[in-house]
């Protein structure tokens, strides 16, 4: 009987310990939830987080323009090359984002409301154009290596970008004329589709170029570096555009995932860090190598 009593006591003790652990976990979850809500609802924390984003974007923009100047000093005899345009667009996109986040609270109260959507969405469109340019560059290299004509690539690049901008402008105009929830959903879903298209572009041409480079001997250090460069950039850009696509789908239908409001600063910080700041920083670092001086090798120039 004493043994039975010990077992009952032990069982009761374990139950109390388990209940106590569950209570502690629930309390921790509640505290975490309260912390998240407190930060989201605090104007001071909202401004701090938005200003941190502004600083980070400013740093990326500064790095891009420094790299642009270095390239210009290295090969001043060339005009606007693909590499120069890529760094210039990075400078512009990140610079505009920095300014928007510095004045994020003012942007939120701009009237008419369509101006808010334009200021928050234009950098995203420019980001798409910037990295679509990288896809174009890789597609040209891939087809040139296979002795296939690349005459149709640049017109396709400009046509795709023109269609994206025209459709987005049309959505803005309709949203201005009739600001209903359905139009906001359509706008976000359209951009989710654009992001998915960009992700697939990186997967298609980055993957093709990577596989093509793999077939060549990789004894040379330069070719091995190029293989790593293409692999890393493809992975980074595919991932960031895929995350953007998924997040836009959530934001379209769930108010809790809305990024165009002041009271979601933590979500804004995580989102923009993952889909723009980190990818841009990593790509700029990976592509930091300066072009060869004139006479060493060919250099791709935008015509």
Curated annotation (Swiss-Prot):
Main location: membrane
Cytoplasmic side: 70-82, 139-156, 205-232, 287-303
A GO BP entry: viral replication complex formation and maintenance
Alphabetical list of InterPro entries matching this protein: THH1/TOM1/TOM3, THH1/TOM1/TOM3_dom
UniProt xrefs under Pfam families: THH1_TOM1-3_dom
Signal peptide location: none
Transmembrane regions listed in the UniProt entry: 49-69, 83-103, 118-138, 157-177, 184-204, 233-253, 266-286
Subcellular location: Vacuole membrane
Protein's membrane topology: Multi-pass membrane protein
GO cellular component: plant-type vacuole membrane
Extracellular side: 1-48, 104-117, 178-183, 254-265
Disulfide bonds, paired cysteine numbers: none
Phenotype seen when the gene is deleted: When associated with TOM1 disruption, reduced efficiency of intracellular multiplication of tobamoviruses (e.g. crucifer strain TMV-Cg), characterized by a reduced accumulation of viral coat protein (CP) and reduced amplification of TMV-related RNAs.
Keywords from the named record: Host-virus interaction, Membrane, Transmembrane, Transmembrane helix, Vacuole
Function noted in UniProt: Contributes to the intracellular multiplication of tobamoviruses, probably being a membrane anchor promoting the formation of the replication complex.
Subunit composition and interactions: Constituent of tobamovirus replication complex. Interacts with the helicase domain of tobamovirus-encoded replication proteins.
Family: Belongs to the plant tobamovirus multiplication TOM1 protein family.
Protein name: Tobamovirus multiplication protein 3
Organism: Arabidopsis thaliana (Mouse-ear cress)
Lineage per the UniProt record: Eukaryota, Viridiplantae, Streptophyta, Embryophyta, Tracheophyta
Record gene name: TOM3
């Amino acid at each position: 009987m004493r043994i039975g009593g010990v077992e009952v006591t032990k069982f009761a003790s374990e139950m109390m310990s388990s209940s106590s652990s569950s209570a502690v976990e629930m309390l921790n979850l509640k505290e975490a939830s309260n912390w998240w809500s407190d930060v989201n609802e605090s104007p001071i924390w909202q401004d701090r987080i938005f200003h941190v984003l502004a600083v980070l974007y400013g740093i990326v923009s500064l790095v891009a323009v420094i790299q642009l100047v270095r390239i210009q000093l290295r090969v001043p005899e060339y005009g606007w090359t693909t590499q120069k345009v890529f760094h210039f667009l990075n400078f512009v996109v990140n610079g505009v984002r920095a300014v928007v986040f510095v004045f994020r609270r003012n942007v939120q109260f701009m009237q008419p409301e369509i101006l808010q959507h334009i200021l928050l969405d234009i950098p995203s469109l420019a980001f798409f154009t910037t990295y679509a340019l990288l896809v174009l560059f890789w597609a040209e290299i891939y087809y040139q290596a296979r002795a296939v004509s690349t005459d149709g690539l640049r017109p396709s690049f400009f046509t795709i970008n023109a269609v994206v901008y025209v459709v987005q402008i049309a959505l803005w105009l309709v949203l201005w004329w009739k600001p209903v929830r359905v139009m906001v959903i359509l706008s976000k879903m359209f951009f989710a589709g654009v992001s998915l298209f960009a992700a697939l572009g990186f997967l298609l041409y980055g993957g093709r170029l990577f596989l093509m480079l793999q077939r060549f001997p990789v004894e040379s250090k330069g070719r091995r570096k190029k293989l790593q460069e293409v692999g890393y950039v493809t992975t980074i850009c595919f991932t960031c555009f895929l995350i953007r696509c998924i997040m836009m789908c959530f934001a379209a239908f769930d108010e809790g995932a809305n990024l165009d409001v002041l009271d979601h600063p933590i979500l804004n910080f995580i989102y923009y860090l993952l889909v723009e700041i980190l990818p841009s920083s990593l790509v700029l670092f990976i592509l930091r190598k300066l072009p060869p001086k004139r006479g060493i090798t060919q250099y791709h120039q935008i015509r």
